[in-house]
């Protein structure tokens, strides 16, 4: 990774943990249309139920989130321990949370009228939380959107659509200059892949307007239609964003530790927008959410956990409870997350390693009956001492060269816990390990 990209993505290593907000007209029906409940992703309901755009956009007349309070949203995120939030400025349906002058399908033309996006940007920034913009290139509401470009008429229409999209992106960058990142979606269709030049143009345009802004890999396509990574295998954009509701394997996929990457996950199995019935799919527990966060950080990545607000502007009780649970754990254990990176140590069944400087953190999710946690260090690395984050020492016994048993606490904490290892290593150990991966 070149130094220019590394400087732009320094926030990755510092922040590590973010929140996703999927909010749009789809929150009003909440997965149900004309009496039928669709188990698929609620933000795709227009597609599942085959609702014409004109009929779908009639939902704008009902958009009036009277319980919305951006300051409460921001405080909840702060208490949860997130360092940044990604907000859906516009999802595939085409409804804009800001008063765009390039379309009628905006919050300005609803009973609510006010600039929701602007309220959120200010509230989150006031809490010290960076704001990132999700933006769907695909726009079901626009007459010039095309899934493919096959005729001269398609080409002319799609050219107009790209100009429209340019204008909306420039508008967002101008109205909200504190935005730190653009996270693009809806770029997988042939129409975009045949216009890879445009994705490169958008990246340049935004970086000229907002020096330091980062762009996800999902935007980009090269001249051959390859996405995320070009035909030569080089990452496009500033960080890889292909890990959606999945994570790289901690043993087989170590290549990801060589670049910045970010995963995003839902709490139900596949619901990004608000769905009224979470019983239709498995819902992750707070510990399962925590494990995915730690898993990502242990491989040098970030994790973004999604919340789908209700149409009235409030969050469902399950999301509020999840935020409290995650926040309580982060308050005690956040030092093993923020600013941490891949440790380069052999994965063990009890959990994950993260690293910050000469400190290696053991984040324990699975407790062995032996009460001993096996640690295997790279050649040239010694464990000097071990302690819980409250400062209590933990016994360490060297059982073989570069192998140790680390005792569990006398009393199990009843939740995932962290042991900090202070280490000493020969010069160049980490660099040699990373070089071996290239």
PLM features: residue spans?
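Mature catalytic domains of secreted/periplasmic carbohydrate-active enzymes
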Residues: 1-438
């Amino acid at each position: 990774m070149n130094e220019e990209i590394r400087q732009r993505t320094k926030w990755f290593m510092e922040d590590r943990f973010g929140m996703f907000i999927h909010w749009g007209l789809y929150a009003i029906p909440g997965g149900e249309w004309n009496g039928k409940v669709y188990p698929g992703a609620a933000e795709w309901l227009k597609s599942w139920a085959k609702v014409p755009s004109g009929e779908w956009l009639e939902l704008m007349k009902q958009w009036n989130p009277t319980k919305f309070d951006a300051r409460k949203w921001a405080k909840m995120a702060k208490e949860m321990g997130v360092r940044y939030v990604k907000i859906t400025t516009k999802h595939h349906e085409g409804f804009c949370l800001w008063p765009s002058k390039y379309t009628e399908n905006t919050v300005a033309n609803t009973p609510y009228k006010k600039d929701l996006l602007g309220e959120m940007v200010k509230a989150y920034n006031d809490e010290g939380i960076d704001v990132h913009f999700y933006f769907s290139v695909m726009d079901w509401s626009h007459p010039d959107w095309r899934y493919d470009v096959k005729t001269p008429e398609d080409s002319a229409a799609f050219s107009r659509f790209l100009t429209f999209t340019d204008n909306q992106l420039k508008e967002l960058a101008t109205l909200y200059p504190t935005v730190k990142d653009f996270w693009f979606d809806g770029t997988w269709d042939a129409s975009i892949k045949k216009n890879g030049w445009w994705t490169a143009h958008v990246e340049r345009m935004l970086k000229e307007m907002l020096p330091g802004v980062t762009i996800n890999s999902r935007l980009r396509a090269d001249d051959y239609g390859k996405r995320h990574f070009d035909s030569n295998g080089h990452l496009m954009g500033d960080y890889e964003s292909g890990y959606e509701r999945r994570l790289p394997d901690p043993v087989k996929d170590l290549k990801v530790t060589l670049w910045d990457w970010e995963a995003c996950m839902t709490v139900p199995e596949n619901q990004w927008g608000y769905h009224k019935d979470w019983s239709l799919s498995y819902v992750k527990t707070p510990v399962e959410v925590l494990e995915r966060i730690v898993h990502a950080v242990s491989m040098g990545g970030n994790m973004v956990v999604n919340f789908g607000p209700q149409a009235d502007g409030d969050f469902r009780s399950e999301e509020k409870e999840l935020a409290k649970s995650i926040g309580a754990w982060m308050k005690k254990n956040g030092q093993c997350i923020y600013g941490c990176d891949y440790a380069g140590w052999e994965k063990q069944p009890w959990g994950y390693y993260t690293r910050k400087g000469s400190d290696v953190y053991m984040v324990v999710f699975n407790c062995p009956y032996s009460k001993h946690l096996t640690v295997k260090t790279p050649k040239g690395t010694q464990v000097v001492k071990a302690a819980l984050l409250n400062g209590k020492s933990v016994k360490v016994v060297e059982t073989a060269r570069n192998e140790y048993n680390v005792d569990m606490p006398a009393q199990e904490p009843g939740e995932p816990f962290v042991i900090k290892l202070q280490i000493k290593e020969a010069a160049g150990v980490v660099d040699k390990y990373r070089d071996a991966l290239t």
